[in-house]
A protein has these predicted regions:
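Juxta-kinase regulatory segment immediately upstream of eukaryotic protein kinase catalytic domains
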Residues: 1-42
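Active-site-adjacent loop/helix micro-motif of nuclease/hydrolase catalytic cores
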Residues: 70-84, 123-131, 170-172
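Protein kinase-like catalytic core scaffold
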Residues: 61, 114, 160-162
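Generic beta-strand structural signal
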Residues: 57-58, 107-108, 154
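ATP-binding glycine-rich loop module of kinase domains
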Residues: 43-90
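Catalytic activation segment of kinase domains across protein kinase-like and atypical kinase folds
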Residues: 145-191, 195
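Conserved structural core of kinase catalytic domains
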Residues: 67-69, 89-133
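Protein kinase catalytic-loop region centered on the HRD/HxD motif
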Residues: 136-143
Length: 210
């Protein structure tokens, strides 16, 4: 039997999850359905909101659900998969697509999701600048907003930016360290994995099997 790729495995499971999430209109509905799933399955579903490098490093595959553009949740969240695709298209036009992780965007039961690629190593505080040329560095700063260590990893020795569409409409102020950018500071409060810290301003939820 042909072994499925991580995109194919992720797509099959994303369809199962999306069907379970039909009828969920609040964060509590959504959270309750995940807990219900975990009580009836041997392989527990891990989750995190926003971006999660640890999940991408350890997971068999990673599924990122974005809230539907029409406001899947009753509080009116908007999805950003279309923004991610637009940023990737701009990268292709500029010959810089190799800097970005290419996600597989799918829609099941009205819910948009993307199957995330796996990265070999998370970003380190110092070292990203040794993997890019001055032209590549300039493109990243001119086109992406959230260039902090939780948003990139390394693939084949080169930087690979993940989740690059988050509010990607304004360039950051270039500094000697991406972690000192205002976007990094604004994102650090959104990295907790506890239920009680589920942020009302996050735009996505990531699922994976450890």
């Amino acid at each position: 039997m042909k072994k499925l790729t991580y995109e194919e495995r992720g797509a099959k499971f994303a369809e199962v999850l999306a069907k379970r999430f039909e009828g969920c209109v609040t964060f509590d509905d959504f959270r309750r359905e995940i807990q219900r799933y975990n009580t009836t399955h041997v392989r527990k579903l891990n989750w995190d909101y926003g971006v999660s490098r640890i999940a991408i490093l350890r997971a068999d595959y990673v599924i990122k659900f974005d809230f539907a553009p029409t406001g899947w949740f009753s509080d009116g969240h908007a999805g950003n998969c279309s923004s991610e695709e637009a940023v990737y298209a701009r990268a292709v036009a500029d010959g810089m697509e190799h800097l970005l992780a290419k996600t597989t965007v799918l829609t099941f039961h009205g819910l948009t999701c993307s199957i995330m690629p796996r990265i070999k190593g998370v970003g380190t505080r110092y070292g990203w600048e040794r993997t890019v040329t001055p032209k590549e560095e300039a493109w990243l700063f001119d086109n992406l907003k959230d260039l902090h260590k939780y948003n990139y990893g390394f693939r084949k020795g080169k930087i690979c930016v993940i989740d690059y569409a988050w509010d990607a409409v304004e360039p950051v102020t270039q500094t000697s360290d991406w972690e000192t950018s205002s976007s990094y500071e604004s994102m650090t409060c959104e990295t907790s994995t506890t239920w009680n810290s589920f942020s009302p301003v996050t735009d996505s939820v990531i699922f994976s099997f450890a």
